[in-house]
């Protein structure tokens, strides 16, 4: 039976510790030739609005643990300026909405096991990757984090960093003062 798993359900069961451990295991499998992956590919097409492009993105991978997955994203991409700083923004349908979907299959019989909304999962995955980097590459006594941005990805990274290091000080670089200050309060 194919499962349909939404963001709320993922938030209820997936911890950052579990995500870091799963990704570490995946990287070990990849190094041992027991897993495969294709890096993300994004394809852009101009829309009727010259300031926006449609972007379709996919990435996929699997392992001898028995699973193969493909992640698909559908976005509208544009540039936005705030106080002289230009950033790339994206959304699906309207700002604030995102459309990412993972199809999980069995490598043993090809069965479709699950449709998974990737909104929360992708933040956890990217944050955990940062945490793994800090775990193995940062000085063992590092206590200060400098982070660019104050959005969802910054939150996921900080959650991962605090799982692998004792963080005493956070320096946030974000163009929007209100967002930067709120992020600092929430992370304290």
Language-model segments: residues:
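N-terminal ligand-binding/catalytic initiation module
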Residues: 1-125, 131, 141
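Short helix-loop-beta connector
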Residues: 137-144, 166
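Active-site cradle of extracellular carbohydrate-active enzymes
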Residues: 147
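Glycine-rich Rossmann-fold phosphate-binding loop(s) that bind the pyrophosphate
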Residues: 150-151
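N-terminal Rossmann-fold NAD(P) dinucleotide-binding loop
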Residues: 154-155
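Aromatic pocket-lining residues of Rossmann-like dinucleotide-binding sites
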Residues: 161
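NAD(P)-binding Rossmann-fold cofactor-contacting core
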Residues: 164-188
